[in-house]
Regions:
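Aromatic-anchored transmembrane helix interface
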Residues: 67-76, 88-112, 123, 130, ...
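N-terminal signal-anchor transmembrane segment
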Residues: 1-54, 77-86, 139, 383
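Alpha-helical transmembrane segments of multi-pass inner-membrane proteins
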Residues: 118-146, 157-222, 245, 381
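Hydrophobic transmembrane alpha-helices and their immediate junctions
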Residues: 126, 218-229, 348-384
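A juxtamembrane structural motif centered on a specific transmembrane helix
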Residues: 1-10, 182-183, 367-372, 403-417
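A membrane-periplasm/extracellular boundary helix in multi-pass inner-membrane enzymes
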Residues: 137-139, 198, 219-289, 307-311
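Long extracytoplasmic/lumenal interhelical loops at the membrane interface
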Residues: 287-349
């Protein structure tokens, strides 16, 4: 058994750990939330064990590179200290454990002798496409509320996947440039962009289009584009369009996904007034109201945070303590956050917590050389941007792993491929 496990790439175990939350949500949707399997902890322990068993650790890097993570450790120590004045009694410990998994992702990558970004990307792509397929099959956010597999899956546990998968696919759009085959890069780039549009996350769609535009400009400036490459791109694009056309004609689920992507932008624009193309006005209006409520709720969280943060000097400098947001907001002790990690850090850990986080990023600025060729760093940046709108600081395992790869394992992989 051990011999079999040793043959599996360490990047596979790392991906299992980083995406453990997705596996957990999928299990909940099948068996309900009564199932008590701590997948993140199990996969985290498995990752560390395989690093040891495969003998691919380099512990002396902890001593050699301590300046790269000293502020990250101080951030964790400050988070621990803030528990002493946090109003949360129960959730705070879950949040502390979540922070711990972020640091495990960072230090797990740090102590590895080497990591292949290409193998990492292959496994990451496979799993991301797999979860996207599951999401499309179940279609948990269907406007018609007609859930095909309702007898087998409880769709409520994966309704938020459209945002998470959107973030992951943007990461994939950048990491695939670690491949050497141009055809594979183009197809994966277009497939990722296509899936993001079908998922319907507004911000991921906008950011994905921006990333695609920047990649195009970069390739043009560096004169990497040639006639052969353009022919391959348009050939691949034609195939993707044909597949989408067939699905649009033959699949009701596909049309439902496409429709949802269109109407979600109505929340941000008043120009979408012609709704005659919709067959189910009542369900559409109900879904639209839910989208408006979601948008308004996030705005309410931000305004509430602003008021509380500047309430006094103590709240600004020290914050209200780790895991305290829900207690301060509605006197409940549960998972709740303002959907912006900077606001979340200042609210719970004060300016001290924010400055420690910034110090960690700034202290590694020398490792960010070759910015446009450091694919892991670019991918981490997109996750950081996304986290300003829809993440909590305990949900950033992938971000921390990519930062560690960009700092300790950057080997000048370029977009020239």
């Amino acid at each position: 058994m051990i011999k079999l496990l040793k043959k599996i790439d360490i990047e596979f175990y790392l991906i299992l750990f980083l995406l453990s939350g997705m596996f957990k949500n999928l299990l909940f949707s099948i068996y309900g939330n009564n199932i008590k399997i701590p997948l993140t902890i199990i996969f985290g322990i498995l990752l560390i064990l395989m690093i040891y068993i495969k003998d691919i650790y380099k512990l002396k890097r902890l001593k050699e590179e301590y300046k790269s993570f000293i502020f990250l450790l101080l951030f964790f120590v400050w988070s621990l200290f803030s528990i002493s004045y946090s109003s949360s009694e129960n959730y705070v410990w879950y949040k502390l454990l979540g922070l711990g998994t972020n640091f495990l992702a960072f230090f797990g990558v740090l102590i590895m002798k080497e990591i292949s970004l290409k193998r990492f990307t292959i496994y990451f792509s496979y799993f991301t496409y797999f979860f996207s397929l599951i999401f499309f099959m179940i279609n948990p956010n269907s406007i018609s509320k007609n859930f095909i597999f309702h007898d087998y899956f409880n769709e409520i546990y994966i309704q938020g996947w459209y945002l998470v998968l959107g973030q992951f696919l943007i990461v994939n759009m950048l990491l695939i440039f670690s491949f050497s085959e141009k055809k594979k890069i183009i197809y994966n780039l277009l497939i990722s962009l296509n899936i993001i549009c079908l998922l319907g996350g507004r911000f991921p769609i906008v950011l994905a289009l921006l990333v695609f535009f920047i990649i195009s400009i970069y390739l043009i400036q560096k004169k990497y584009l040639n006639k052969k490459l353009l022919m391959q791109f348009f050939k691949s694009l034609t195939i993707i369009i044909l597949i989408n056309s067939v699905l649009n004609l033959s699949s009701k689920t596909y049309r439902s996904l496409l429709l949802r992507s269109v109407y979600r932008f109505e929340v941000l624009s008043s120009s979408f007034n012609d709704l005659n193309f919709l067959n189910d006005q009542e369900n559409y209006q109900e879904s639209l109201n839910q989208e408006n409520n979601s948008f308004n709720k996030r705005l309410e969280y931000l305004l509430f945070s602003k008021t509380k943060i500047f309430e006094n000097k103590s709240s600004l400098i020290l914050g209200y303590g780790l895991g305290s947001f829900s207690n301060e907001y509605d006197q409940t002790d549960r998972r709740l956050y303002p959907h912006n990690i900077i606001v979340e850090m200042v609210f719970e850990l004060g300016l001290i917590g924010l400055l420690l986080a910034l110090a960690f990023l700034i202290s590694n600025s020398s490792s960010y050389k070759g910015f446009f060729t450091n694919l892991a760093l670019l991918a981490a940046l997109t996750l950081l941007i996304n986290s300003m709108k829809s993440s909590s600081i305990v949900d950033l395992r992938l971000l921390f792993a990519l930062l560690a790869i960009s700092i300790f394992h950057f080997n000048k992989l370029t977009l020239q491929n």
